[in-house]
Amino acid sequence: MTEPTTGKRRADAVRNVEAIVEAVLNGGIVGGELNMAAVARLAGVSRVTLYSHFPSRQSLVEAAVDRAIAESEQLVEELRLDLDPPPVALDRFVSSSWRMVDKYHSLYTAATTELPTGRLTALHGPLLGRMRTLILRGRRDGSFRTDLSVDWLVATAFSLMHQAAEEVEAGRLSARKAGSVISATLLPVLRRE
């Protein structure tokens, strides 16, 4: 008799966690800050329920970043970048990634406040790994430079993407043009001289 109740609670808990993370991604961050009361309200749960699943702002931001990155990974997977020459694949990767950075720019702002830099970078690991693979493929076919470390080039791409988000936030760069600006900046950095 207790198993169905436990199973129901687990299903409710899963639904609550999903609703809470969705609330963060869809309006729970205001002015770059996570508002726990707003998240609870948007998720349709009490603050007690919110804190029972996410005891800290950091844990909630981390879960939301993880979800946003999983969504980004799915989009990148659908691009089938291995079918394009590396420069074309890079442009498509940047364009797709930019759409996600722009969509979740408030989350990124909150994450830079709530999460240690190393943790934020680690959460981006799968996407950084895809960028690394793409750069290595470009090196093998002669499209991309070999005089700088791959780690440096990946870090440069990651930083450039997020700097563009800050420029958009500050009103110095159009969100609509940012993807092409990032590609126009990054491709010359990567190209073999």
Which positions does each model-derived feature cover?
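Basic, helix-initiating cap at the start of DNA-binding domains
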Residues: 1-42, 59
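Short hydrophobic/aromatic patch on the recognition helix
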Residues: 44-54
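A secondary-structure capping/hinge motif
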Residues: 58-60, 106
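Alpha-helical DNA-contacting segments of helix-turn-helix folds
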Residues: 60-68
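Helical hydrophobic small-molecule/effector-binding pocket
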Residues: 84-111, 121-125, 129-133
